[in-house]
Regions:
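Alpha-helical bundle segments that constitute or directly flank the non-heme di-iron/ferroxidase center
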Residues: 2-29, 51-58, 62, 135-138
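Amphipathic, non-membrane alpha-helical segments in soluble helical-bundle scaffolds
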Residues: 3-14, 39-46, 89-93, 130-133
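Solvent-exposed interaction patches of small proteins and small membrane subunits
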Residues: 4-12, 34, 66-69, 83-87, ...
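General structural signal for secondary-structure boundaries
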Residues: 2-8, 19, 27-28, 74-75, ...
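Acidic/histidine-rich alpha-helical segments that form the ligand environment
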Residues: 12, 16, 23, 80-117, ...
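Short, contiguous alpha-helical
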Residues: 31-77, 104, 112-154
């Protein structure tokens, strides 16, 4: 991956929060708990993104700061099932926003050597900083599309 590709992915990563906020815009409280078919509800997605952002932010920091870290997976479905219920989504959206902004600032300052750093993901195997960026650059946008489906927009 070259510097221009990384820059584009960092921009997309940073934009993920905006995409989520736009997808949620205008939803009434009761609509936060409706989903398209068997997908997560918008409320579950908002809370999942906060959990995911906090987890992924630490993963990236470990990849950059530690030599060959083991990056632990977690059971996203259980987090969604047990931790989302009826909580307001605003704190989770703020957690997502701040975790992404802080992490984007780190990404923008990585050296070529930093981009080559890697560890081992407990579920995926070899896991590099570039792998991390490729996954999380699209994560918010993918869930924004899921919210749009719950609204019947796609």
């Amino acid at each position: 991956m070259d510097a221009n590709e990384r820059k584009a992915l960092i921009s997309r990563y940073r934009d993920g929060h905006r995409a989520i906020v736009k997808a949620l815009e205008g939803l009434r409280e009761e609509e936060l708990d409706r989903s398209a078919s068997d997908e997560w509800t918008p409320r579950m997605i908002a809370h999942h993104l906060a959990d995911s952002e906090m987890t992924s932010a630490i993963r990236l920091r470990r990849l950059v700061a530690e030599d060959g870290p083991v990056i632990s997976g977690y059971d996203e479905a259980q987090f969604a099932k047990k931790l989302t219920t009826d909580r307001p989504i605003e704190p989770s959206l703020e957690a997502m926003r701040w975790a992404r902004e802080s992490t984007a600032q780190i990404l923008e300052r990585l050296t070529e050597e930093d981009w080559l750093r890697a560890g081992t993901h407990s579920e995926r195997g070899p896991y590099s900083v570039e792998d991390w960026l490729t996954i999380y650059a699209n994560h918010g946008h993918d869930h924004a599309k899921q919210i749009e489906r719950s609204r019947g927009r796609s």
